[in-house]
Amino acid sequence: MGTHGIPSAPPGRRSGPGLLVVAGAGLIGSRLADMARDSGWRIRILHRSGPGEASREGIEIDASGREHAWWAPAERILAPGALDGARAVVCLSGAPIAPRPWTPARRRALAASRLSTTALIARVAASLPPAGRPGVLLSGSATGFYGDRGDEILTEACGPGEGFLSELCLRWEAAAGPAARAGLRTVQSRTGLVVSSSGGLGRLLGAAYRVGAGARLGRGDQWQPWIGLEDAAAGLLWAIEHDDIRGPVNLTAPEPLRNRDLHRLMSRACGPPSMAVVPQVLLDRAGRTGVAGGTGSIGSMLAELLGASQRAVPQALLASGFRFTAPGAASIWGLGA
């Protein structure tokens, strides 16, 4: 038995159930692929293609036994056979939410990179004969779904909030609708701040703190849901392998942090210590602009990403028996509480 309660596969096993990972080169997708392989899954990565590659038939296999297929989601082209033999499909495709400012053009790109990809995969999966369909489609979302909710404890049963991110996540989750209506089990991963030195928003924050540019945001009262990369990948694999899990899943650690505590931990871990504070009035102004559908400046982006209070808890994962290896943030940076 491996960590998180997930069984490990015998060494050398490569003929297990098929897992198709869309955006398999991303931070979470690449770690999920490695973890699933070690648990006995046969991995297939779906890559964005160059000219002419999307129509390539068949599946290519590299020296490690990993399979590769191609697609061109903007043109709604998926390589024939890409889903053949896939018992599960994970679609986490989407342009990075930060650090580029949310200009109108950027907002359109953020939406298109999520909605068109998820919708295409869902439609193709739904169109397959019942015997050839994957058992589960796991698609992306984020805790931005909830908007700014103060101290409210946010389980998967809570509704959406307001703002650009909330609307984007609502549409993102709905994009998997064709698969759900066809009877496939669908799961939507509402992911928090992923803490990793390898990439993602957590890496961007760490880089800022290392050069002394980290800051507490306003009063620092806002709750910020986070999760370590290992737990994030394991949580996705757990959701894939447990048929009783369906619908939204908060991919967050059990102990969300207030911003002031996140600031304290990152200052200690990354140094040099920072006493900087972004004035609350600036966050409030940026937040009002974002909810009103403003032009999407850097301030609006920070207000929704880090200024909003989202006390999200992983009720679905905990209720199903998933075990977190890093339930508290201090352990991620090797610090005491």
Residue ranges and their predicted role:
Residues 235, 242-297, 334-336:
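Mid/C-terminal beta-alpha module of Rossmann-like enzyme folds, strongest
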Residues 204-231:
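A conserved pocket-lining segment of Rossmann-fold NAD(P)-dependent short-chain dehydrogenase/reductase
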Residues 1-13, 303-337:
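C-terminal amphipathic/interface module of NAD(P)-dependent oxidoreductases
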Residues 64-117:
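NAD(P)H-binding glycine-rich loop region in Rossmannoid oxidoreductase-like domains
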Residues 141-142, 174-197:
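Conserved beta-loop-beta element that borders a ligand/cofactor-binding pocket
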Residues 18-38:
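N-terminal Rossmann NAD(P)H-binding glycine-rich loop of SDR-like oxidoreductase domains
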Residues 118-163:
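Conserved Rossmann-fold NAD(P)-dependent oxidoreductase catalytic core, especially the SDR/UDP-sugar
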Residues 182, 195-205, 230, 239-249:
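Glycine/proline-rich active-site loop of Rossmann-fold NAD(P)-dependent oxidoreductases
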